[in-house]
Amino acid sequence: RYWMHMAHHDNPAHVGIRTKTHKLIYFYGCNYDGGYQTPPGWELYDLATDPHETINLYDDPNHAELVADLKRQLAETRKRVGDDGSHYPAVEKVVQEFWDYDLKDRQKAQMISREFLKRRELELKAGKRNIKTHQGFKEASYPE
């Protein structure tokens, strides 16, 4: 699990699993209190044919069985290592909400994406953005 979220590295929160040939990543995209920051989504890469991870195969019907198997493995691994969501229940709620990534989930993710874009454009236009720290929110300015 990548825990830094958007707070310091501008990298959406995610979990994933990797085999010798494939990598499945779930960008659940919320901060530790469950607030939506980036749109949730899944990515699947064939590391043998696409080592630079440029072609997302998640929606390819030829990989549906592999996606289901890797999701099962990811869920089992999370359980085995104690990543059951109990420490961050708001995050786990978002993780579970978008786990299946059906049409309804995708539509909601698109809405979140539009909201994120609007918020980000306003922040950049103003020359600053909110940076979430462990102490709360603080304003950060960028040099011109």
What is the predicted function of each stretch?
Residues 1-43, 47, 52, 65, ...:
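C-terminal cap/loop subdomain of S1 sulfatases and analogous C-terminal strand-loop tails that border
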Residues 59:
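Phosphate-coordinating loops and pocket residues in cytosolic domains that bind phosphorylated ligands
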Residues 70-74:
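Short amphipathic alpha-helical coiled-coil/interface segments
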Residues 88-91, 133:
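Residues at secondary-structure transition points
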Residues 98-144:
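Intrinsic low-complexity, glycine/proline- and repeat-rich
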